[in-house]
Amino acid sequence: MNFYFLPEPTIHGGIKVGFQFAAMLRQLEIDVVIATPNGSAPQWFSSQLPVLSQEKVIPNLTPKDRVIFSLPYDYDKLKKLPARMIFHCQGTDSAIIPILQDEKVEILTCWTQAEDFVSEFLRDSENVGISVSRNFYYSGESKLSRSYATMPRRGVLPFPEKLNGFKEYQIDNMHEDVASQILKHSSGFLALSENEWFGLPSLEAMASGCIVVSPKTLGGVEYLIAGENCFVEKVENLSELMSEVLRSEQKHQHLRQRALEMSYRYHPRAQFKKLQKLFISGGLKFLR
């Protein structure tokens, strides 16, 4: 049996990525359940996955079981358990180095930058991909001109006065069904966090038909292509650039279309097909 250990399911992209991955494994007839502290389930996105209490799962684990985890700080606790370990890598800082040095741990990655980082430690990994929830995909909703969306918990917007006169929608502490509707009706999306591991909110905004203005990211370089499907700028220049974009939206419609096209590479169908191929090739045999 596979048990995916996740922390308290607060609003963090890694939580949703874990649930999405587990859901696809179940579609592929792989036995997997989620284990969280006290068995708490997420309230900010929809999921039909069974969720168990970590406290109840841990005493019953055997060497035949597998524990999947993505939070590096869970490693010290989980390595003491009899189950085999699988690390679902969603970030590449020094906290994951002890995990990479443990050859008993199987490694899964979600994007190319993480895959490359893992290989620097002479470890093989399987890139299982990442996907945007279906409800974010644009389907012809009307866009409010001169409007943009932000996620204030991701960072502080410098020089906000440069965006006076434009309509701002703040996505904060809400269900993703509401967030997706905001993005579908917003003309632009202003990312605030520099050097994100991947930057899933920007990709969700691209799927929603937004013109994205973003600081540089790490893993996000595989989908954020400056000048082709988005704008990438220094943090201190983000407000001014967003205002320029919103003043001349029609001139940038090609970015909106290219962004939407790019986002379909991360549609759930694409990730599911990727996983199917990995199982057929034997790359994920340790999950069976």
Language-model segments: what does each one mean?
Residues 211-214:
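Short hydrophobic beta-strand element within catalytic cores of glycosyltransferases
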Residues 33, 39-103:
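Extended catalytic core of nucleotide-activated donor transferases of GT-like folds
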Residues 17, 110, 114-180:
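Conserved catalytic-core segment of nucleotide-activated headgroup transferases in glycan assembly
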Residues 6-17:
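A short, glycine/small-residue-rich beta-strand->loop->alpha-helix junction that serves as a flexible
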Residues 194:
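Aromatic "clamp/platform" in nucleotide-sugar-dependent glycosyltransferases that forms part
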Residues 180, 203-207, 221-222:
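Short alpha-helical segment that forms part of, or immediately flanks, the ligand-binding pocket
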Residues 226-237, 244-250:
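Conserved acidic donor-binding segment of nucleotide-sugar-dependent glycosyltransferases
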Residues 236, 247-286:
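A charged, aromatic-enriched C-terminal amphipathic alpha-helix characteristic of glycosyltransferases
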